[in-house]
Design a protein with these regions (language model features):
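Conserved redox-cofactor binding core of oxidoreductases
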Residues: 1-67, 72, 79, 120-125
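A glycine-rich dinucleotide-binding beta-alpha-beta segment and adjacent secondary-structure elements
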Residues: 36, 42-57, 62, 212-270
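Hydrophobic alpha-helical segments, especially N-terminal targeting/anchoring helices
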Residues: 62, 107, 145-147, 158, ...
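Short hydrophobic core segments
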Residues: 70-81, 104, 263-265
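Flavin (primarily FAD) binding-site architecture
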Residues: 78-92
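Glycine-rich phosphate/pyrophosphate-binding beta-alpha loops
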Residues: 86-89, 119-125, 238-239, 270-272
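An anion/pyrophosphate-binding glycine-rich loop and adjacent beta-alpha core
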Residues: 103, 109-233
Length: 272
């Protein structure tokens, strides 16, 4: 953007949103709201089996003790996220298994555009589960280089951005759009045979980096790496499900364009 206009909380925006929601739902005045931790939704209950347009009347859940319990209700809202665990490398948590989409499909809802998956271009390499390195870091001035680019830059000197492979793929260089950067990085890795590229921050102020990206710094410290002195090994990883449950503008689940009474889908699990 020509002006910085994205609302964020350093590199912990998601955690801050989650914390605010947790605080709001656990405070006084939230009568009628019951949170069931470690319960797993198994399936949606239809008013008439195999008749999606008859409507929804609840869900079946698997309790931690292995007992299945019925929860009745006039509406079910699916907010189960994406399906990143289908991929070998993903930034998603282990619970992102696409169960909400599967449940909606089994009760007759239309599912759209599941072939479209967004890949984040900079996930920390060498982790059991890739750790997302925010794009804000490239906005801060970090530059993507191949291992060979980095060796050449250290030897010859000059502007770090002049040595980035991204110059071949986008006039914006390392600030290219997420899809362009992810595809470019994948292409470079296939050509080089390397397992990762490097996110270079050596040319940036270390104190400013630590102030702006405390969570990332903490994770890198655990790996024996430091923003500033060390190039960070990164590679693309599955990040966001673009498709999902077909809904209208009110989030109501659809079957052949008709509303399924009582079924709603919001967030990543919906296709909006």
């Amino acid at each position: 953007h020509s002006e910085a206009r994205i609302l964020h909380s350093k590199d912990r925006t998601g955690a801050e949103i989650e914390g605010a929601l947790e605080a709001a739902t656990s405070g006084e005045g939230m009568t009628g709201l019951v949170i069931k931790e470690d319960w797993m939704a198994i399936d949606i209950i239809q008013k008439r089996h195999e008749d999606p347009l008859s409507g929804i009347c609840g869900i079946w859940c698997l309790k931690p003790d292995g007992v299945v319990e019925t929860i009745r209700g006039s509406a079910v809202i699916l907010a189960t996220g994406g399906c990143g665990m289908l991929y070998n490398s993903t930034t998603n948590p282990t619970i992102a298994t696409g169960d909400g989409v599967a449940m909606a499909s089994r009760c007759g809802a239309d599912i759209r555009d599941m072939e479209f998956i967004q890949f984040h271009p900079t996930a920390l390499e060498g982790q059991e589960r890739p750790f997302l390195i925010t794009e804000a870091m490239r906005g801060h001035g970090a530059v993507l280089m191949t291992v060979e680019d980095h060796i050449r830059w250290r030897k010859e000197g000059g502007l770090a951005s002049d040595y980035s492979y991204m110059k071949k793929y986008s006039p914006m260089g390392s600030l290219g759009t997420r899809d362009v950067v992810a595809r470019a990085t994948d292409a470079e890795l296939k050509m080089s045979g390397e397992s990762h590229v490097l996110l270079v921050t050596e040319h940036l102020d270390e104190d400013s980096l630590r102030d702006s990206f405390p969570t990332i710094c903490k994770r890198l410290d655990e790996q024996g790496l430091s923003l500033g002195p060390d190039p960070i090994p990164v590679r693309p990883a599955a990040h966001y499900l673009v498709g999902g449950i077909s809904v209208d503008r009110f989030g109501r689940g659809l079957k052949d364009g008709e509303v399924i009474p009582g079924l709603y889908a919001i967030g990543e699990t919906a296709c909006t």
